[in-house]
Amino acid sequence: MSDTKVYPVPDYIREKAHITKDTYEEMYRRSLDDPEGFWGEQAEKFLDWFSKWDKVYHSDLKNGEIRFFEGGKLNVAHNCLDRHLEQRGDQTAIIWEGDDPNNSEHITYKDLHERVCRLANAMKARGVKKGDRVCIYLPMIPEAAVAMLACARIGAIHSIVFGGFSPDALKDRIQNADCETVITADEGVRGGRNVALKSNADKALESCPDVKNVFVVKRTGGDIDWKEGRDIWYHEAVADVSADCPAEELDAEDPLFILYTSGSTGKPKGVQHCSAGYLLGAAMTHKYVFDYQEGEVYWCTADVGWVTGHSYIVYGPLANGATTLMFEGVPTYPSAARCWEVVDKHNVSIFYTAPTAIRALMGQGNEHVTKTSRKSLRILGTVGEPINPEAWEWYYNVVGDGRCPIVDTWWQTETGSILIAPLPGATDLKPGSATLPFFGVEPALVDPEGKELEGAASGNLVIKRAWPSMMRTVYGDHKRFMETYLAAYPGMYFTGDGARRDEDGYYWITGRVDDVINVSGHRMGTAEVESALVLHDAVAEAAVVGYPHDIKGQGIYAYVTLMAGVEPSDELKKELVKLVSNEIGPIAKPDVIQWAPGLPKTRSGKIMRRILRKVAANELDSLGDTSTLADPTVVDNLIEDRPNK
């Protein structure tokens, strides 16, 4: 289909790039042949150590043992702040862009360091110490980054819960991590509307009697309930303490944070990351995958409630002494030009977002993009799901004016940092492909029996060796870690994703392994069918699932969102069926097409396919938890409008 189109590395990028094709091949080979030497060198280059490690790594994936830089001591906040003060204390660390376009703030490294020390001291004054878990439930405001770094400074372990999660989801996460301290705000602001946070936290905390401290940031000044003795105003707490707080010396393997993965059934699954290996992964990939150059402004549009925000808004950029942009708002408020206006306003060089946002903006029309300059842009990135080639082409040609390489990054909450992605100065691009593995990452494709597949092939994506930023365990449940990730293919990490490797060795992620439809014995990745549907000019977005079919075993059920102003019709349905048939083959023709003005998405933009499968199968009494959806009413509309009643 689109495999044949190749975009070579632009000369102007190659000339200044940190990594070229030759250096990539040489460093990649070395990272596999001499991991001890390679990772030791990178840890010296990217991180500042109080004392050096005894052993570079110990890895036994069969038994779930992963350790890097054992015996070494460092502090993550020191690496993100203190070591930069002499050289770049007055440089902007964080540009905060508020929901309201008139609100923005530049925070220097010196200022950020002081804010972090003050909060660290305020937490210590309330009894928070090394190893304690702290729940952060905040909107996208500077205090979120301050809270993360203040925890890291004193060795407390943060657990961020996305500000859009329900009181129930928050309660489960507070209880699972045994948090005694919560940092929240009165309200958040998003798309021109106030979002309740403190009242949600209060509801959650009714079932969490162990929580002793609740720091409350005053964001809007809205009315909130107050519990004396437990609740404390953030601004008062940080004003009462010293701005001097020495960074705790931590072991390389000491936990840095727990982050709960969405979409898992049953009790929450807390992915636990350690200090040194995680920070090395975040810093290296931030510099090399985005080819970050001194003085550039870097903008990752994620929320800090997701791993992308942890690694590529806060830890990676700040470890590298970069200027990182933090955005409180949404891409379509006050208009669909907002992202590009922010790019122009702050001279953003590198822009990293999700395919779902790209498709939404594409559906709004080109004029919102073309009326802005975007001249400062140099590198574009995508994250969160495979990007269909059409959205890739639009992003490349319309947003990037055909001159900015796109780094299509594949990684997971569990991997801590990017594992498969192009490097701007080294990798020729193919729209829709995550391309090649990062240093030290050895991917493989296996069949369901675990037999490794050679050459061009399709199979389950596994990683054959540990890497520094890999999760170390599921918090409080190592058995679950083993069962979920390491038991399926002993000695390898199972990603849960399917992938195809082409004749050039490029990887194409085909979606979760449970996003495979088996039609009359033919296996088909849902991403493939979705890519065919969105080729049609009338289609903004499509989600495809399997459903029980009397004859074929599984049929193909497509939910289709149309571009603004396009009217649904039977004629259009026929066109779409024909298009898929032409693109992939008659076997891939959708059996059911349902027009869907909205799709059920988590707030990080991931489509909840589990819900789509249930609606398609008419299993409406077992939809499961919908509290993490950005807009739960979408589900009611899908149920109401389903053609298979």
UniProtKB/Swiss-Prot annotation:
Its EC number is 6.2.1.1. Keywords: Acetylation, ATP-binding, Ligase, Magnesium, Metal-binding, Nucleotide-binding. The keyword Acetylation applies. Transmembrane segments: none annotated. One of its GO terms (cellular component) is cytosol. CoA binds at residues 190-193, 308, 520. Its cofactor is Mg(2+). It is an enzyme of class 6 (ligase). GO terms for biological process: acetyl-CoA biosynthetic process from acetate. It catalyses: acetate + ATP + CoA = acetyl-CoA + AMP + diphosphate. The modification N6-acetyllysine is found at residue 606. SUPFAM superfamilies: Acetyl-CoA synthetase-like. Mg(2+) binds at residues 534, 536, 539. Acetylated. Deacetylation by the SIR2-homolog deacetylase activates the enzyme. ATP binds at residues 384-386, 408-413, 497, 512, 523. Belongs to the ATP-dependent AMP-binding enzyme family. Catalyzes the conversion of acetate into acetyl-CoA (AcCoA), an essential intermediate at the junction of anabolic and catabolic pathways. AcsA undergoes a two-step reaction. In the first half reaction, AcsA combines acetate with ATP to form acetyl-adenylate (AcAMP) intermediate. In the second half reaction, it can then transfer the acetyl group from AcAMP to the sulfhydryl group of CoA, forming the product AcCoA. This is Acetyl-coenzyme A synthetase. It comes from Alkalilimnicola ehrlichii (strain ATCC BAA-1101 / DSM 17681 / MLHE-1).
